[in-house]
Amino acid sequence: MDQKFSRFGQQREHLLERIFPEGIPTLWCPLITHYTDDGGIDRKRMRAHLEHISPYVGGFLLPGSTGDGWELSEAQSRQLIEYAIAETTVLGRKLLIGALGQKTDTVMDSIASSLALIRQLNGGDGTTAGIDGRPVCGFTVCGPSGKDLTQAQIRSGLQAVLDLGLPTSLYQLPQVTGNEISAQTIRELAALYPNFYLFKDTSGTDRVTASGFRNAILLRGAEGNYAQHLAGNGGHYDGFLLSTANGFARELHEVRSLLEQGSTTQAEALSTRLSTAVNEIFSFAQTLPDGNAFANANKAVDHFNAFGPAAVAVDAPMLRCGRRLPVRMLDFTGEVLKRHQLMPQSGYLQSVGRNAGTEQLKAA
């Protein structure tokens, strides 16, 4: 988690030193949302998952796309944020709050609602609203949605958010927004707003980092070829904010650790094996009629992490739509995990009977 702040400029450097006194996390996770049978937030199940991956993950994003952030009700988002603040405080991890919406007004309303909750929970003052890295370290926002938007329109929407003066992460997600924030727009915003301190790119095109932009923390959100994208191994990124950290946090952490130890061959071999498995699982998840592929793929992997090789015998996870993840998704995921030697020997949860639901689960 050691990162130098000097490249970011004095104002941004001071912000980062305040929010990340122990260093910038290099692996972040957009946490999946677990649901009870009646559609509520399953806090017990989420806590077990969070505790399982937190040894390898330094920061969390919630609610994000992987956690159904675009579909959650305001009440559900509030429940998740309140839960996440409490849990990450105990675990000593950082928390980015997702303020997702297709229009800037929706994003602004989401931020206002979250700020009110943060003030209520941790007594932040009117300036920082409690965003001091304990645990909340800012908001994550996408540009406004629309495939025909100009860069001027995208920039205007992002400026409205950045004008709030809050620590902010910008999220490149063309799969949802239908557009990309250009490298020039990112560069101009960074020059104007020192509170813009982190850029996450899930586009897979890497145009912003390829342009030489380095004035913010750079996290890659696109899956695959993990080793080659890290700075120090020929890449441009400081770390990852990956949906697969929900299920492969240990392996992703190990890729970076091996690179830092100089074991490049082993790191790239693990990266390739992991990339192949992830591609297969995600490709299958895209064929499912319900839910989004990010959530479905990661819930399937997490299900095996929770229950081990016999996970198919346990009720599948609930989806946002109120139906369970199809058993065929679990069958396929289990086969992929076994073939690529990624199947855990045992699960982090212990059921008390065959087909046990979440009400019957307890931490192992």
Region locations from a protein language model:
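Active-site beta->alpha loop and helix N-cap motifs at the rims of alpha/beta catalytic domains
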Residues: 2-178, 314-324, 328, 337-363
